[in-house]
């Protein structure tokens, strides 16, 4: 009937996003749901499927590196996944081409953030990004934290600037370490989009408000053009208002806007 035809047409019009998956990744279900709710057609894309050319990144408007423990965090969180890309010439070229296309976007969350931090040689405008190392607590931190969104060049946070929001962290190597020179460059270029804050709303490096000891509370960094974003916390785990630690009368989660902004970007 006509209604079914409309549904088929609408499905075809949805932008396609590749939810990347590698051995040990476990955050792909929530991430796929988050982007699907925002109006994307989410594809489960195993890295080997790209190597075997079952999928081509060119066919997608966005790619996401999800959370988990890729390759068991052997030799450092995210290292195995990143090296799989860097040491396969065809794969490296394909990702470099995608990262360079400013009409498309890339997102790395948690383990995905760790992966992107190790791919700076193929991500334009990421040369000043921080390194990620073991949490100051020297243990895995999995809980709610408070963050403040600041004005940046990342479209993901459009209209969210100034918001102080709870979010979930789950990592053992999330400390963003950076020297003063690179920090100043990132700040000048508006590449810093979110920071950890304490109970008074002040940016902090102190535990437990800052779960890992990141410099100046940094938790989210974008490329110079703004189309590539790496962040340690999980916005996809707070899509339902019932998942928030504090009861609210709001109908929708404020983190829904994060994913809706991605849809606006590709449109």
What does each of the following model-derived ranges do?
Residues 149-267:
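C-terminal and late-domain segments of enzyme folds
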Residues 1-109, 113-125, 133-142, 148, ...:
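N-terminal beta1-alpha1 cap of cysteine-dependent amidohydrolase-like domains
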């Amino acid at each position: 009937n006509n209604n079914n035809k409309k549904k088929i047409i609408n499905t075809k019009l949805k932008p396609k996003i590749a939810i990347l998956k590698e051995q040990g990744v476990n955050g792909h279900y929530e991430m796929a749901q988050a982007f699907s709710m925002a109006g994307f057609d989410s594809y489960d894309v195993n890295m080997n499927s790209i190597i075997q050319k079952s999928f081509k990144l060119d066919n997608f408007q966005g790619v996401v590196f999800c959370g988990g423990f890729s390759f068991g965090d052997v030799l450092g969180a995210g290292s195995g996944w990143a090296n799989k890309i860097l040491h396969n010439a065809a794969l490296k070229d394909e990702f470099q081409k995608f990262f360079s296309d400013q009409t498309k976007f890339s997102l790395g969350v948690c383990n995905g953030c760790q992966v992107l931090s190790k791919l700076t040689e193929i991500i334009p405008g990421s040369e000043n990004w921080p390194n990620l190392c073991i949490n100051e607590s020297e243990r895995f931190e999995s809980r709610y934290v408070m963050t403040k969104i600041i004005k940046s060049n990342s479209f993901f946070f459009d209209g969210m600037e100034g918001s102080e929001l709870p979010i979930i962290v789950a990592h053992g190597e999330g400390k963003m370490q950076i020297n003063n020179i690179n920090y100043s460059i990132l700040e000048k270029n508006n590449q810093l989009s979110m920071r950890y804050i304490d109970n008074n709303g002040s940016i902090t490096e102190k535990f437990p408000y800052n779960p890992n000891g990141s410099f100046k509370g940094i938790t989210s960094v974008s490329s110079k053009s703004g189309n590539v974003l790496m962040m340690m916390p999980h916005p996809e785990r707070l899509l339902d208002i019932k998942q928030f630690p504090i009861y609210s009368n709001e109908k929708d989660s404020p983190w829904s806007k994060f994913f809706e902004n991605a849809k606006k970007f590709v449109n």
